């Protein structure tokens, strides 16, 4: 799989890095199977023996800066997958059929900013990350977009034998074809 990385160090404790790669994606044996599975009284899963492998293109750009206790990272990425194997659903009589096909394309634009301060006096550190993922699923019979904003905040305090750590995450959802999956909002205090 071809991969390209360009890294340039800038004056003032910062750098810019560009990465790009191309990779293959092949259908799974389960997706290629012509077998029909009854999920429940309303749903059927059906394989597709006509699926074809496809290419995935990914590129990202990072800018990072650090000075003393201050740190920042700005990151952006673009993913493009023409002929991606994605799900599609349709009605067949009184059943909903889920199957897979080589769809038109899948794209994702992503951006993220991380800011960190610390450690202050080797005891206290704060970090915040905010970002967005914008998904575009272009199927043979559908076209969907979905945008997911997310953030992560962390604080830690250490003094002698005592440690305190707090973390908060909002969910990071993934959108592929006609399926939205994701996590939960969490908080941790240790």
Language-model region placement:
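A generic membrane alpha-helix/interface feature
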Residues: 30, 37-39, 86, 93-95, ...
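Hydrophobic beta-strand residues in large extracellular and virion-surface proteins
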Residues: 6, 16, 63, 113-115, ...
């Amino acid at each position: 799989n071809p991969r390209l990385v360009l890294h340039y160090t800038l004056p003032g404790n910062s750098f810019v890095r560009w990465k790009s790669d191309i990779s293959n994606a092949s259908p799974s044996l389960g997706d290629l199977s012509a077998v029909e599975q009854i999920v429940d009284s309303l749903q059927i899963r059906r394989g597709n023996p006509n699926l074809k492998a496809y290419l995935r293109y990914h590129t990202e750009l990072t800018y990072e800066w650090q000075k003393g206790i201050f740190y920042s990272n700005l990151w952006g990425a673009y993913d493009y997958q023409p002929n991606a194997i994605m799900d599609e659903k349709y009605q067949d009589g009184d059943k909903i059929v889920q199957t897979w096909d080589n769809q038109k394309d899948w794209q994702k634009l992503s951006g993220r900013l991380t800011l960190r301060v610390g450690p202050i006096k080797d005891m206290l550190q704060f970090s915040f990350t905010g970002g967005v993922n914008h998904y575009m699923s272009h199927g043979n019979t559908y076209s969907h977009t979905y945008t997911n904003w997310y953030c992560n905040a962390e604080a830690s305090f250490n003094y002698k034998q005592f440690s305190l750590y707090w973390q908060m995450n909002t969910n990071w959802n993934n959108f592929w074809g006609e399926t939205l999956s994701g996590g939960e909002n969490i908080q941790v205090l240790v």
